Amino acid sequence: MKNRKDYLKLLFLISLSVCLMFFINEHYIKADKKNPVISSTEPAVTPKKKTKTSDLPISAQLDVPLLYQFDEPSLYNGCEVTSLAMLIQFYGSTVTKNELADNLVSVPLMDDDGYMGNPNQAFVGDVSGNDSPGLGVYHGPIANLAKEYVGNENVLDSTGSDFTDVMAQVAAGNPVWIITTATFSPVDDFVTWETTTGKIDVTYSMHSVVVTGYDAESIYFNDPYGEKDASMDKKNFIAAFEQMGSQAISLFNN
């Protein structure tokens, strides 16, 4: 009797093992059909459409008016609005950097609860630099400000796109507002701020210029610090542009 019980027990365990092996094998076969790389934990990313370099002219150069952010009334922290004024004036407007600064939404550098301002939401601090320090502002508030002057349909915020798209706009006759760094190359002085919407990394080295041209080796730009068609080698300039989030705005004269 004991041998019979042992035999039945062994038979049961063998049957159970076979069933489990079949189930596991079937499960992974189905999973493999759905996910070609089972071990990957990275989410699927849709590749960005970008302009091919081969589709661009070898070089392009635009004559964009130069504005100096330190012309009185000076804007010590006003590189973003000064660059935007250059962009708008290129299409024939007489808007000034100070008018744009007056109409740009702003927040304190630090609020009463100790939270830092967020440049994605507004200009952080004092754009003039007369009353208090300031950091700057990112593409969102600048694009919204531009729309007030030229209309929604004439503003293209291409933030996140490849730099070849910036070059394509220049080749098409449209200068481009961008965020870069003061050295026009990557920097290592980022700090983390706690804002009301979460933590962000910022650098006081942020800067804004207008891309006016390019050729095989260099990018040309109007610098609101006072230089027209300044140049920088492509590699460093593009690396700084990407480090700052590939922020870019262009306008159309429809």
Predicted regions and their residues:
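Short, Lys/Arg-rich N-terminal segment immediately upstream of the first membrane anchor
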Residues: 1-7
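Active-site-adjacent structural segments surrounding the nucleophilic cysteine of cysteine proteases
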Residues: 7-140, 182-184, 189-192, 200-202
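A residue-level signal for beta-strand positions that form part of recognition/binding surfaces
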Residues: 59-61, 175, 208, 218
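Stable alpha-helical elements in mature extracytoplasmic
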Residues: 75, 80-84, 96, 100, ...
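A mature extracytoplasmic/lumenal domain signature
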Residues: 83, 159, 180-184, 213-215, ...
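Sec-exported extracytoplasmic/periplasmic mature domains
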Residues: 84-96, 105-109, 147-154, 171, ...
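Predominantly the structural core of cysteine protease catalytic domains
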Residues: 118-201, 205-208, 251-253
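Noncatalytic regulatory segments and standalone regulatory/sensor domains
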Residues: 190-196, 200-203, 209-254
